[in-house]
Regions:
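N-terminal membrane-anchoring alpha-helices
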Residues: 1-19, 219, 243, 251-252
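Catalytic core of membrane glycerolipid acyltransferases/transacylases, capturing the structured
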Residues: 6, 15, 29-90
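A generic structural signal for well-ordered alpha-helical segments
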Residues: 13-15, 74-75, 101, 132-133
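Short gly/ser/thr-rich secondary-structure transition/capping motifs
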Residues: 15-22, 90-92, 149-152
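Membrane-interface helix-loop junction between the first two transmembrane segments
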Residues: 21-31
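A secondary-structure boundary/capping signal
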Residues: 24, 39, 61-62, 79, ...
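Residues at the C-termini of beta-strands that transition into short coil/loop
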Residues: 26, 63, 84, 144, ...
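Non-catalytic C-terminal accessory region of glycerolipid acyltransferases
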Residues: 92-252
Length: 252
């Protein structure tokens, strides 16, 4: 009820003060579990997308939005789900709540980048989006949003009116038809996520960079890769027939 009331109040304002153009709305199924995966340019993305989609959209939003009273009331009122970017139990709980919504035939909105990127490029997607889609066996509609960074630059509290905003919805993707229920296979999750990010890049017109938008996530990825490289190096050295101390000095 609160969601519908807020939407009814804000929709006329949206169309009055912002030059919004929506393309591909016909690609959005009107029933059944649906996951909308979109690039993230500004805080107001979570305002524009629900207002142009007929169905109720429950967004998986970063937990920081629920820590300030300035944004807490809005996200709670419209039933959004807080996602801790640190991962672990809190993140699994958020994905579990989102899965329940999808399995009950609802619509979830998610930003695979995990946060707003520091520049205008599309950054590497986190695999939770693929895990969620495969677990729910639902369709994924990629979406590209343009212009919201100009409407609300990073750090800006107020929206700048009369700026053009373009939202494009792509064709639905059925990951389950391609990967079945292999949601515990990290290679499958990575490939499926990259497929989604490719479609988002096509729709948003952004250049893609194979790097996480979050510094913490990127640091963790680099540490994981470094550890993997270290393990390979140790295995290589141990397999050599020559003196190991000499081999280590040669490979350093």
């Amino acid at each position: 009820m609160v969601y519908g009331l807020i939407k009814a109040m804000l929709t006329p304002i949206l169309w009055l003060f912002f030059r919004v153009r929506v393309t591909g709305a016909e690609n959005l199924p009107q029933s059944g579990g649906l996951l909308i995966a979109c690039n993230h340019q500004a805080f107001c993305d979570s305002l524009f997308i629900p207002l142009v989609v007929r169905r109720r959209v429950t967004f998986v939003a970063k937990a920081e939005y629920f820590e300030s009273w300035k944004t807490l009331w809005f996200f709670r009122a419209v039933g959004q789900i807080p996602m801790a970017r640190s991962g672990g139990t809190a993140s699994q709980k958020a994905l579990g709540e989102a899965l329940e919504v999808l399995q009950s035939g609802g619509c979830i909105g998610i930003y695979p980048e995990g946060t707003r990127p520091p520049d205008e490029r599309l950054h590497k997607g986190r695999t939770g989006v693929a895990r969620l889609a495969l677990a729910a066996r639902c369709q994924v509609v990629p979406a590209g949003i343009r212009g919201t960074r100009a409407v609300q630059p990073i750090g800006a509290r107020m929206l700048r009116p009369f700026k053009p905003v373009e939202i494009t919805f792509g064709k639905p993707i059925d990951l389950s038809a391609r990967y079945g229920d292999r949601l515990e296979d990290p290679l499958v999750l990575r490939q499926a996520t990259d497929e989604i990010m490719f479609e988002i890049a096509q729709l948003s017109g952004q250049a893609y960079v194979d790097r996480y938008a979050s510094r913490g996530a990127q640091a963790a990825e680099e540490a994981r890769l470094a550890a993997a490289d270290g393990s390979k190096l140790a295995a290589y050295v141990d397999a050599q027939p020559l003196d190991r101390s000499m081999a280590r000095s040669q490979l350093a």
